[in-house]
Amino acid sequence: MTKGTSSFGKRRNKTHTLCRRCGSKAYHLQKSTCGKCGYPAKRKRKYNWSAKAKRRSTTGTGRMRHMKVVFRRFRNGFREGTVPKPRRAAVAASSSS
């Protein structure tokens, strides 16, 4: 029984497959857990000892469909249902014609 170089050629089964949550090939088939995001755990796996890994998958690295809108609304103070004041240039142009 060898446990080194000669036994590596006998490996032929897949231990990891694609994860449903993060998409990486880190989902362990026998353990049924993802090594990257921790699926099926409810909380996403993240550690401070790898600041670079956090940077790769934090807010702002994707589309941010919702957060883009929130940032814009925040700048305007989350106002809703108001009508903008008419601009002077627009008022002058409409009155002259």
From Swiss-Prot:
GO terms for molecular function: rRNA binding; structural constituent of ribosome; zinc ion binding. GO terms for cellular component: cytosolic large ribosomal subunit. Keywords: Cytoplasm, Metal-binding, Ribonucleoprotein, Ribosomal protein, RNA-binding, rRNA-binding, Zinc, Zinc-finger. Its main location: cytoplasm. SUPFAM superfamilies: Zn-binding ribosomal proteins. The keyword Ribosomal protein applies. It comes from the Eukaryota. It is found in: Cytoplasm. GO terms for biological process: translation. A zinc finger (C4-type) spans 19-37. The keyword Ribosomal protein applies. Zn(2+) binds at residues 19, 22, 34, 37. Belongs to the eukaryotic ribosomal protein eL37 family. PANTHER family: 60S RIBOSOMAL PROTEIN L37, RIBOSOMAL PROTEIN L37. This is Large ribosomal subunit protein eL37.
